[in-house]
UniProtKB/Swiss-Prot annotation:
InterPro entries in alphabetical order: Paramyxovir_NSC
Pfam families cross-referenced by the UniProt entry: Paramyxo_NS_C (PF02725)
Domain of life assignment: Viruses
Organism: Canine distemper virus (strain Onderstepoort)
Protein name: Protein C
Family affiliation: Belongs to the morbillivirus protein C family.
Length: 174
């Protein structure tokens, strides 16, 4: 080492720069002043927001609506089956030509709702083609559909297809 680079009374520039860098890095690692600020009351701390995409929330809403819808369909199906069992055996056996009554149409419609989750116009037209010219059966079909439109909650009617929601709207207009 040369005598020129070292002076006991005054350190060289290179040593001073190294010493400053060391002090800065040591000070930045501990940061005692900033830690004291963080120890202050937590009420001042900024709240973090949780961001959830709209797609995720709409999927969750659809899932809950679907689960509620299936539960309602099961409840309606159980209620209709209890009603059908309560109707006497004489009434069931008296219709030898298999004329559909209101309860039988409701059972058929609820079964369709459970399987495909929709009652469409094509299903309605198919039901009309099966009952052909029987005025009583056409009335029974309409009564059954109106009852279903009233039983199923309004916020779930759009899930059932187009028939029940249309019947519910026409009932509200009358």
């Amino acid at each position: 080492m040369s005598a020129k680079g070292w002076n006991a009374s005054k350190p060289s520039e290179r040593i001073l720069l190294t010493l400053r860098r060391f002090k800065r890095s040591a000070a930045s690692e501990t940061k005692p002043a900033t830690q004291a600020k963080r120890m202050e009351p937590q009420a001042c701390r900024k709240r973090r927001t949780l961001r959830i995409s709209m797609n995720h929330t709409s999927q969750q809403k659809d899932q809950t609506m679907s689960a509620m819808y299936l539960k309602i369909i099961r409840d309606v199906e159980n209620a209709i089956l209890r009603l059908w069992r309560r109707s006497g055996p004489l009434e069931r056996t008296s219709n030898q030509d298999l004329e559909y009554d209101v309860i039988m149409f409701m059972i058929t419609a609820v079964k369709r709702l459970r399987e495909s989750k929709m009652l469409t116009v094509s299903w309605y037209l198919q039901a009309l083609s099966v009952i052909e010219d029987s005025r009583e059966e056409k009335e029974a079909l309409m009564i059954a559909l109106r009852i279903l439109a009233k039983i199923i909650p309004k916020e779930m009617l759009h899930l059932t297809g187009d028939i029940l929601s249309a019947l519910n709207r026409t009932e509200q207009l009358m």
